[in-house]
Amino acid sequence: MKGTVYLICDSANNLYKIGVTKGDINKRIKKLQTGNATELFLANHHISEYPYRIETMLHNHFSTKNVLNEWFDLSHEDVVNFRNICKIMEERIKCLENNPFFMKKIH
């Protein structure tokens, strides 16, 4: 089932949230904005058949830059390359999806 892996920026703190939505990305941003005193905006995104797996892989990939939960202190280069990183991860998943040792449920 398709979903969107997103990178949302907290403009005041220059932190980025890596998350997933299966719905409308703009509605997700509005929901996150509620109760948040600083402006949030979409910095980058990737639509995928494997959004939850890619989100997990991204959290692992950027683990040294993790600040709190799903919020990360990413560089400009990380933000610019986000979609390419997601595409590489998606290709890895596709190569391994028939391997029974990789995962039981791919989505």
Segments the model singles out, each with a brief description of its role:
Residues M1-H107:
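Non-catalytic accessory segments flanking enzymatic or RNA/DNA-binding domains
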